[in-house]
Amino acid sequence: MHEVTVVGAGLVGCLAALAFADRGHKVALYDARPDLRSEAELKNASLRSINLAVSARGIEALRSVDTKMAERVLADIIPMYGRMIHDLQGGQHAQAYGLWGECINSIDRAQLNRTMLDVIEDNANITFFPEHKLTNISLSRKDKKYQRPTSTFETKEGEERVVESDYIIGADGAFSKTRDRLQRYVRMNYAQQYIDCVYLELKIPKADGPDPFSISPNHLHIWPRHKYMLIALANGDGSFTSTLFAPPALMEQVCESQNTFISFFKEQFPDAYELMGESQILESYENNPRSPLVSLKCSPYNHKGECLLVGDAAHCMVPFYGQGMNAGFEDIRVLMEILDEKKWNVEEAFNTYTERRHKDLVAIVDLAMRNYVEMSHSVVSLPYLIRKKVDGVLGRVFSSAWVPLYSMVSFRADIPYSKALSRSARQDRIIGNIVNWTSFAGLVGMGALFYYKGRHLFGRLFE
């Protein structure tokens, strides 16, 4: 039996704790925040609601740890079968995600986290320590007082707590203290990028009447406006969590005053304005921050068999592919598979994990960045729609050999991200050739038609 320290009790940290505990190991789970289930935190959560999309990779990872736990935490998901595009005139146009009726699922992040903490509380192999802020880690026996890796925490009372364990799992998010400390022990390549986009959370309240949903709950709603966009995902109570994404300069401009913000909404999202109501829009405007979006990559993820980074601590991505949580959950499934494969030789397993997982995580971080352009602009462009139509036809006709990129990423947990990306690149070249040749054939056909009609016309003129 190993003693495991998991830093960070977010979604990925909770799943990591449950996975190690399921293998019979003793887990200590630490988080800098108060318990999310406390009365004060529940009140804060009611002011802001962040929805996530859970798809095949995340569901498969949850089930790989505990099928009953997976059923419990996924009880309130809302299936989304495609995008619903809202144009400037208030028209709605559906775009299916999959070829065979597949779906991704909307889920409330805070509720999912609370449910996982409830499951953890019932597990005798896990002890949870909220309000413990990591300040340092010591590896490779640098601290002569201890024979194993140590983690140092500061409690809410300001006291120092030093914890010894067999290894440390860093799941403490994009601004990971574990990663920061780990860089003293490894030559870590690290890249961080803030994109030219900030976001503001809004809300569509539930409707009055027997149907609480004012728009379809089974679609991801998108108001694409090229350089900015609005999205909305359904909640179980009939409301929708909505998010405005825009360049910082534009966000600052439209948020200059209540009047400018309301005018912007009326002009650019007229149907969303009606759905939200002016008072709800102003409440979000006054109370919710304009938050940045960051993307990061690093490598390696580990130091020997003593410390390993997972989730956002290793690979933070922008939210436009809906894969942040799914990739983090998949980290845990892949890690457990490698540990079993290496018969729990932890150092060999951690090294293999870094080597095997890195290319997949780079692929999904890059795909997420690329998908912002698709969601905000391409979904309404004719070339994109033509290529998507061709992609779908080929996927249906050659279903065993041709899978669209979105389907590979969101519905096929058996296809690694990097393989999905390389396979998609080959398919894109084929689609490009088909579209080009079809266009060329069409032009030749039109030219022949005009030539024939022209000869016929001139022939009659000179009869």
UniProtKB/Swiss-Prot annotation:
One of its GO terms (biological process) is L-tryptophan catabolic process. GO terms for molecular function: FAD binding; kynurenine 3-monooxygenase activity. It is found in: Mitochondrion outer membrane. Its cofactor is FAD. Its EC number is 1.14.13.9. The keyword Membrane applies. Catalyzes the hydroxylation of L-kynurenine (L-Kyn) to form 3-hydroxy-L-kynurenine (L-3OHKyn). Required for synthesis of quinolinic acid. HAMAP family: Kynurenine_monooxygenase (MF_01971). This is Kynurenine 3-monooxygenase.
